[in-house]
Amino acid sequence: MTQDELKQAVAQAALDYILPHLEDDMILGIGTGSTARLFIDLLAAHKGKFDGAVSSSEASSEQLKGHGIPVYDLNSVDSLPFYIDGADEANAQLHLIKGGGAALTREKIITAVADKFICIADASKDVDVLGKFPLPVEVIPMARAHVAREIVKLGGNPVHRQDCVTDNGCQILDVYDLAIHDAPALEAKLNNIAGVVTNGLFALRPADVLLLGTTNGVETRFAAKP
């Protein structure tokens, strides 16, 4: 199977996972990226079975609205039973690197609200050690140089993502040359640097379910109980 076919398979698997649980008044959390886009297209056929969605990016919001799915402000929503989104890397603990699409802050906020985070990814995203994919860090523009210097002290090689302004009006540093063996600790350490909005490690609050597209079919993994 091609990578696109694997993405399509996991998008379908995510739809199959949530369909039995949909209710008329339910609002879903929807992520950003190529796999999330496929999921939104599949979800559109079932838009009458739930109330609407909260989205992690303007791009996803426009796609949802284009399908006639209402999009809500998270501040008006009391609960999100499910959040469905992709990842740039995932390890065995369901710790993730996200943010290749520069939507990491909104993704992390929605993840914090959601009861269950369902991550959908193809097998190329499955890694033993996080960090081959550059770790995005969203920063307040005036703090970019300061944050970059602090990241160098941690062993990373930060590169300013040119011509990228996030939906929050911030900038992205992509951090190379990291082998991340303690993702929760690094996530907390980076977030404590003045000027960092957040970083793309999802380890303090990892995925609950990983639907991984492989050549042998979709593999379902669950986060270990604390």
From Swiss-Prot:
The catalytic site is made up of E107
GO CC, alphabetical: cytosol
Give GO BP annotations, semicolon-separated.
Answer: D-ribose metabolic process; pentose-phosphate shunt, non-oxidative branch
Q: Recorded E.C. number(s)?
A: 5.3.1.6
Pathway listed: Carbohydrate degradation; pentose phosphate pathway; D-ribose 5-phosphate from D-ribulose 5-phosphate (non-oxidative stage): step 1/1
User: What GO molecular function annotations does the UniProt record carry, in alphabetical order?
Assistant: ribose-5-phosphate isomerase activity
Q: Which reaction does it catalyse?
A: aldehydo-D-ribose 5-phosphate = D-ribulose 5-phosphate
Isomerase keyword on record: yes
Matching InterPro entries, A to Z?
Answer: NagB/RpiA_transferase-like, Ribose5P_isomerase_typA_subgr, Ribose5P_isomerase_type_A
Role noted for this protein: Catalyzes the reversible conversion of ribose-5-phosphate to ribulose 5-phosphate.
Q: Please state what the protein is called.
A: Ribose-5-phosphate isomerase A
The beginning of the lineage is: Bacteria, Pseudomonadati, Pseudomonadota, Gammaproteobacteria, Cellvibrionales
- Give the gene symbol: rpiA
